[in-house]
């Protein structure tokens, strides 16, 4: 067989050279293989597997599988050594072959024993039963090496018996099937071996049953599953086509419902065990298990899966490379770190394959002979082994450095920190503690009493053996962090409330122990804002955001965020509760991120409202799709439906706790459309406002729809237009000035924009309009007195600015259509001045006043600012707005 590719490859593989020299590879079969990526179709075409199964020719099946392996492995070697293929092709090809071999052997074994004993039948379902094979480890992640063994677990659906004359229990039947499957692949014959089969990852290992029912597997995982088995099952993949519930029952074992920072210590323990074995056996040259090796890259990917996979289904992946890429995409790891790990992983796996190509041995140890070393270096593109070794060490050092950064032991308490232990003692020196607390600016009596209350309280005394030491380690650090704030007592009280609240979740305590660098940041945030402190108490899962690379990144790409949210929702697989929780976690994370940035002074009030409004838009669009998909009895795939935002949402002036003023519209001639879209409106509202285990999203207000609470939940666009033209009150047209299309069908958006424009530009009697708006303002006084301390309802306050702008739009948009654009009140005052409708000086002063009011409202909410103090500055702002009011309306509203 003459081919330059073969000549190149055989220098680097004794195994390939033997196959070629012994005539084991027929040119007419092998050479065409070199020009393509092998698929299952190629494996199927290699032999008449159906005939072999029909004839129950076990010897022929074993021979053909082994011969096929010889061709597959040889093809992989030639293509890889000649750099025709890449790592992904290599690992996927051998994994696909493993899947094929397992299924082919299983089909044979099942048919063999079915003919002997009959078909296994489920005791409860009365349906035929099949064996599911779970590939673990590299086989599960499509990451097999050419000389890998395969880790398998056998699971069948339920107990029962076969229906043949020689009846057997399902357990016995599937045990026999499993044994024959193993023999077909694992036995060494004159033709070699297909795969070494390792069954030790099954429950109870070698001492456990070879096969388990799904119920037995679930019970084992719940009652006896160990931490290392979580990591093993993370890559578990069912490779057989038969119906099963394995994924559903394994998922909650692998991926915990809450952030699992306890996984750090479990992973460290596993790594220490491996490192100890490596050290004892002198395996420093092992590129898999040694420092900076393949296993450390895998551990880095898996630790984040273990911690966050229960919350982020997008992380419930099998492959190491795809997991690392997703970590970068989600902002959990820095992109440059992920690129470093991916480059190292590919390099190390390429080396691993070349070590195994040499003689088809499962080895990860670098060679010692000069000849083999030089060949290895050349196959990796280096001139010398020394240069190769340098390149290898660069990758290993980078991996090990990142591994140590991520999985190193928590920082030891420094001497500086240990000095604060006096604050948290079982039997404290009361007088000494009070003096020290006072010296650090605390209200000593208040803080000492709170610390004692916690130590002797029910929650602390009932902490687990794991949780209490973690709690004890955090308290002195909290005291130290609070002492650095301008309001140490308030800060510490909030921190201690938070600590007590999260103490029942040991994982959160583990987070604080694992990331002590976040404590100062946490204290600063809580010291600045009781609202943020309460938000964290309500959603402690947001602790995780403190270590996000995106926490202070103000570049919100809402299109990319919406796409990521969509992926997460799809990963829920139609699980409504999981989707609702996903929406809530996404929204809470973005709100918290914005609040932290806001406290850091990175946003103006207007810009922040733009971001909060964009967040609400994103949530509404995603929730609409989910609510429709969740709808029973619908008559079309895509709803002809839209959501319109009014009020603060429509005007893009949302605050952290604003509710959403919504109107639902549809445009669908179907006779059941009214009923269908009313149900959709009700369902969507529930998606937004319902409290789930992950919390809530928004309070909604639907009273601005036609006819208010007495009206339908959803209106046809025709009915909406008719109402606006014939029945709407002036105040409803005022509301329409701030309305905007949020999400839904583009045809409805076009129709709504047309209707809004036509209504707002309708010819009006300006005197009558002004009188109605003044009357509307007067009606507010009994329920909202115009006190100077209330910037919203005071004369010259927020409401007056809004009414002025609404009047200007309704009175003049017909002549000045630029007033129709929903830019917000500040911009519209400027536009009105440019149109000559109001005095430019008064417009500028009113813009300044409106900004001042919004800052006051915002700071009262976020920064614990006192209720508005009536100062000369505030009164001057009121005065300027009142001047503008009088210029526009000619008179002020009279107090009733």
Curated annotation (Swiss-Prot):
**What's the EC number here?**
2.7.7.89, 2.7.7.42
| GO terms (BP aspect) | regulation of glutamine family amino acid metabolic process
By its UniProt entry, which Gene3D superfamilies does this protein fall under? Answer: 1.20.120.1510, Beta Polymerase, domain 2, Nucleotidyltransferases domain 2
**Would you identify the family this protein belongs to, as annotated?**
Belongs to the GlnE family.
Tell me, what does this protein do in biology?
Involved in the regulation of glutamine synthetase GlnA, a key enzyme in the process to assimilate ammonia. When cellular nitrogen levels are high, the C-terminal adenylyl transferase (AT) inactivates GlnA by covalent transfer of an adenylyl group from ATP to specific tyrosine residue of GlnA, thus reducing its activity. Conversely, when nitrogen levels are low, the N-terminal adenylyl removase (AR) activates GlnA by removing the adenylyl group by phosphorolysis, increasing its activity.
Residue ranges for the region (Adenylyl removase) are: 1-411
Q: What's the protein here called?
A: Bifunctional glutamine synthetase adenylyltransferase/adenylyl-removing enzyme
Organism, as annotated: Neisseria meningitidis serogroup B (strain ATCC BAA-335 / MC58)
Cofactor(s) needed for function: Mg(2+)
Keywords annotated in UniProt:
ATP-binding, Magnesium, Multifunctional enzyme, Nucleotide-binding, Nucleotidyltransferase, Transferase
Q: Which domain of life is it from?
A: Bacteria
Catalytic activity annotated for this protein?
Answer: [glutamine synthetase]-O(4)-(5'-adenylyl)-L-tyrosine + phosphate = [glutamine synthetase]-L-tyrosine + ADP; [glutamine synthetase]-L-tyrosine + ATP = [glutamine synthetase]-O(4)-(5'-adenylyl)-L-tyrosine + diphosphate
Kind of enzyme, top EC level?
Answer: transferase
One GO cellular-component annotation of the UniProt record comes to:
cytosol
